[in-house]
Amino acid sequence: MNSMKYRDLRDFLTLLEHKGELKRISFEVDPYLEMTEIADRTLRAGGPALLFENPKGYSMPVLCNLFGTAERVAMGMGQKDVKALHDVGKLLAFLKEPDPPKGFRDLLDKLPKFKQVLNMPTKRLNTAPCQEHVSVGDDVDLTRIPIMHCWPEDAAPLITWGLTVTRGPNKERQNLGIYRQQVLGKNKLIMRWLSHRGGALDFQEWCQAHPGERFPVAVALGADPATILGAVTPIPDTLSEYAFAGLLRGYKTEVVKCLSNNLEVPASAEIVLEGYIEPGELAPEGPYGDHTGYYNEIDMFPVFTVTHITQRHDAIYHSTYTGRPPDEPAVLGVALNEVLVPILQKQFPEIVDFYLPPEGCSYRLAVVTMKKQYPGHAKRVMMGVWSYLRQFMYTKFVIVCDDDINARDWNDVIWAITTRMDPVRDTVLMENTPIDYLDFASPVSGLGSKMGMDATNKWLGETQREWGRPIVMSEEVRTRVDKIWDELDILGP
């Protein structure tokens, strides 16, 4: 893997600007709806990251569309192109289940990976850029930050790219997660985390171990790209997001202790919110336009009280919006798809490709191609996808095809479904499984069904009929026509 040349978000923006991948907008633009519309049009056109230098009513610039193309996601991970993200996936697969060296030569081959692991511990600083300016007590005022109000029916401005830092009572390592946060007032936010996410689990364990005590929380905004992407990558449970960021970056992640608690935050973050969650303090969150393309339901979530705001001089507020794909989460999903393939292949070597179509809201539908080896094999792979990584807990549909099908070509996939499937025999239905809270199509919030589709050629034991043979032109004729094709001049120049 390549080492990055940027230590913080500003270094990355300098690189993007040099490559023509950042557009500075000096025109006055309103964080209320206007930024969303501009960012959405830009993303759909494959355009650059946007730095709104003159937000209406604010002096702090707003960064949007940072990871609006898969290529910029790859750059953020220190890779030259999207395909190189396979290397990131191979490293994660190795860390998830490391293979012992089989001999001296194999040890030499594995040395680069072991060397990268040395960059995993964090580097703790006594002073840091993220604490150059400090607001405490009555000076804490979230309304001074140009937090975007993304859609007309949204309940309030919404923080979208905050890295929430928590630690459970019995854990050495911290958890970094990205959870949206509704603004309630000048020092109050609603922390919308689902019950299975790391931050929520830390909070549950804290409440059991320290009933009635305040739970420390920090939220970092505008961290370096390796740390941001580390928070959205399917890393092993035993590996911290800071450690993974160190692997990506090629050197240790620099952190600093919060002023009000013992949590450690990215030293180069643009803004850090410190505070606590009071057990039992809840508030109705939503509705908000989400990555599904719909407004979600209102539900109760914990309230995060902000006691300190620390920030860099001339801080930049990093933001995004979510909406019907494509949006920034969908683009991230396309890029991270390349990371997932080697991780799955480590556990299931028969898998040839794995694809999460962005129009399927990034994770709700998966297409798998495989080298089938025995009757019922496709169903085993379905179950494996649903159970191996918790990222696929909410995947509603899994389609399994043979390796002669291109998982990323709907023409191929639909042909396989319509010619190789019997709806009753080849469909697996499961009820009462975990489903995304945002999926209003499920009969009960958080609980719904899943469908697996076996679109592979059927083997003896799976069918009693003679199976069809695909039509393929003879290689001799194809070669002959290749030679005379230009002379035929059928399609013109």
Swiss-Prot record:
Its EC number is 4.1.1.98. GO terms for biological process: ubiquinone biosynthetic process. Its cofactor is prenylated FMN; Mn(2+). It is an enzyme of class 4 (lyase). InterPro entries: UbiD, UbiD-like_C, UbiD-like_N, UbiD_bacteria, UbiD_Rift_dom. Mn(2+) binds at N175, E241. This is 3-octaprenyl-4-hydroxybenzoate carboxy-lyase. It comes from Photorhabdus laumondii subsp. laumondii (strain DSM 15139 / CIP 105565 / TT01). The lineage of its organism: Bacteria, Pseudomonadati, Pseudomonadota, Gammaproteobacteria, Enterobacterales.
